[in-house]
Amino acid sequence: MNFETTVGLEVHIEMQTNSKAYSPSPVQYGAEQNTNTNVIDWGYPGVLPEINKGALEFGMRAALALHCDITQDVGFDRKNYFYPDNPKAYQITQARTPIGTNGWLEIELEDGTKKKIGIREMHVEEDAGKNTHNPDGYSYVDLNRQGTPLIEIVAEPDISSADEAYAYLTKLRQVIQFTGISDVKMEEGSMRADVNVSIAPIGSDKLGVRTEMKNLNSFEHVRKGIQYEVKRQERLLMSGGEVEQETRRFDEPSGETILMRSKEEANDYRYFPEPDLPPIHISDDWIEEVRASIPEMPDKRRERYTQDWGIPAYDAGVLTQTKEMSDFYDATVAAGAGPKLAANWLMGEVNAYLNSKQVELSDTALTPEHLATMIKLIEDETISSKIAKKVFKEIITNDTEPKAWVESKGMVQLSDPAKLQPIIDEVLDNNEQSIEDFKNGKDRAIGFLVGQIMKKTRGMANPKMVNKLLMASLKER
């Protein structure tokens, strides 16, 4: 029997607001434990939450970027459960009126196939705190994260493989990062995925019983977890067993999923309207104001790069992997660099430097203006590509103006025929045998002579001009 896979994804993304969703406590990753929290986060009796307008607008921005319809009359609900990192014993969410519905995201697989994945709904809610279990036998609760604004993005069950899930998460992270509402760093917990997996016989009109994997914190774990879970369920069904609805965790060392608990149903959480927060009406004008704040999305940028600037589709994809790189590229071209050469430098030397140092562009001294100036020096043949690499090392580590630095170091390329010709003549006079070799059709003689000229000029001669003058001189001899 053959089966088809159905994957459901619920993705939680922390929003980078200045303060929490319903309290004035600051949002700051990495702060000392329990320093960014207050009585609202602790759930003290008699304290009242207050809606963070910025969090609501960030949620609207994400919903619009994902082509969702905005719910114009939104309310808030309590999701009731007890856990040490949730001292209120409930989470404020949007069970009845999600901020966005009926959206979609287009993914592209490695073979170039494109597919639209539906977005069922998107909620604005709050994060829980963090439990730490120490070897001393005690568990500790850090409430800095408690109340941090989240968006929960619920995909339709349109994903049918581990690779599609991986592509969806990659594209979702890219789109959200471009909106500017989150840094979407899975390693820091600002993007987490819950995965539902089920299988059913091919052609069946009913979905199989699903299992859930919670809080997967890397795309590769999602892919491997789905692959293992599909095989596990296939083995169960083929041996006459049944798939149980349960929550499992992905164990990285073994590459397997391990049972955590039987799955709760929605009614286990006893949802009811949040009595301390009023419903909010989102006007058409407010929606359009938020829409206007959304920057150009990666798909549009790729289209512009390929159609307007002639950049290959693959290169355009690399340049739009992050908003930081794409913004830097746009600014470099705006500063006067040729689009193709700017793309080559960013994808080549710049990316190589960032990867080797494990840093981001913002951690370096490089500016679009300085990179553009260096590229223009290459384009007008003031410096060679070889010299440009030395210039690049200087401008990415120090706040140095490239043109002034090149001139101060005597690195300006020698292109003046009046200065090059005497050097060429001297090399030819000292290498009669190479002239004979050239006349006898031995092309390698040219390479030798060019090398001698470059040696005489300490590598500063313009290779194009050297070749032009050398060929003319050889024809005269």
UniProtKB/Swiss-Prot annotation:
Pfam families in alphabetical order: GatB_N, GatB_Yqey
Known partners and oligomeric status: Heterotrimer of A, B and C subunits.
NCBIfam families reported for this sequence: gatB, PRK05477.1-1, PRK05477.1-2, PRK05477.1-4
Source organism (scientific name): Ligilactobacillus salivarius (strain UCC118) (Lactobacillus salivarius)
Keywords of this entry: ATP-binding, Ligase, Nucleotide-binding, Protein biosynthesis
Listed EC numbers: 6.3.5.-
Keyword Mitochondrion set for record: no
Superkingdom per UniProt: Bacteria
GO MF annotation list: asparaginyl-tRNA synthase (glutamine-hydrolyzing) activity; ATP binding; glutaminyl-tRNA synthase (glutamine-hydrolyzing) activity
Keyword Transcription annotated: no
Catalytic activity: L-glutamyl-tRNA(Gln) + L-glutamine + ATP + H2O = L-glutaminyl-tRNA(Gln) + L-glutamate + ADP + phosphate + H(+); L-aspartyl-tRNA(Asn) + L-glutamine + ATP + H2O = L-asparaginyl-tRNA(Asn) + L-glutamate + ADP + phosphate + 2 H(+)
The name this protein goes by in its record: Aspartyl/glutamyl-tRNA(Asn/Gln) amidotransferase subunit B
InterPro entries: Asn/Gln-tRNA_amidoTrfase_suB/E, Asn/Gln-tRNA_Trfase_suB/E_cat, Asn/Gln_amidotransferase, Asn/Gln_tRNA_amidoTrase-B-like, GatB, GatB_C_1, GatB_Yqey_C_2, Gln_synth/guanido_kin_cat_dom
Family, per entry: Belongs to the GatB/GatE family. GatB subfamily.
Entry-linked PANTHER family: GLUTAMYL-TRNA GLN AMIDOTRANSFERASE SUBUNIT B MITOCHONDRIAL AND PROKARYOTIC PET112-RELATED, GLUTAMYL-TRNA(GLN) AMIDOTRANSFERASE SUBUNIT B, MITOCHONDRIAL
SMART domains referenced in this protein's UniProt entry, alphabetically: GatB_Yqey (SM00845)
One GO process term, biological-process aspect: translation
Chain's role: Allows the formation of correctly charged Asn-tRNA(Asn) or Gln-tRNA(Gln) through the transamidation of misacylated Asp-tRNA(Asn) or Glu-tRNA(Gln) in organisms which lack either or both of asparaginyl-tRNA or glutaminyl-tRNA synthetases. The reaction takes place in the presence of glutamine and ATP through an activated phospho-Asp-tRNA(Asn) or phospho-Glu-tRNA(Gln).
Listed HAMAP family: GatB
